[in-house]
Amino acid sequence: MALDKLLEQEAQSEIERIRAEARDRSQMIVAQAQERAQALIESRQRALETQRQAGIVRARSAADLDLNAARLTASESGMSQVYELVNQQITEITRVPEYRDILGRLIYQAREVITDAEAVEVNPAEAALARELVHDIAVRENPAIQGGVRVVARGGKSGITNTLAGRLERVRGELAPQVSRLLAE
């Protein structure tokens, strides 16, 4: 019986050793699997965080673009309103007594450029005033001229238009930043 017991003990020891080895190996496999799982989780978290940050950047960029577009639209609308108001003021200026001096200067400046002038063209509403100011050449009515004068030479083949609206249009680009700044305040 002692041999049976001895064999049984050896078998039991071998079983315990194999179980211990299997336990160690399974613990090692589980630990490695947990490490891989943790690494995968961390990798996914980093990827998600990167995507989240990229999404935030895109959202901010889109919001900035929308804001700038809204500002630009508001600025353009404001600029249009300002120039519309200025054009209305120019139309009203032609009705004030001081317009005589303004029209006189516009005629003088245009005639300095066109030295061989044959005629001065003005709006029909300003023709009487222009005739008071110009005595040496013809004054013709031209409904297309508003708030200023057109001086013509060589049978109308050359000429220059000098109007308040034309002057405003020439400096509009230079005034735009200043007007925008004032509208933003």
From Swiss-Prot:
Designated gene of the protein: atpE
Keyword Ligase belongs to the record: no
Function: Produces ATP from ADP in the presence of a proton gradient across the membrane.
Protein name: V-type proton ATPase subunit E
Family statement: Belongs to the V-ATPase E subunit family.
Molecular-function annotations in GO: ATP binding; proton-transporting ATP synthase activity, rotational mechanism; proton-transporting ATPase activity, rotational mechanism
Pfam family, one: vATP-synt_E
SUPFAM superfamilies: V-type ATPase subunit E-like
GO cellular component: proton-transporting two-sector ATPase complex, catalytic domain
GO biological process, one term: proton motive force-driven plasma membrane ATP synthesis
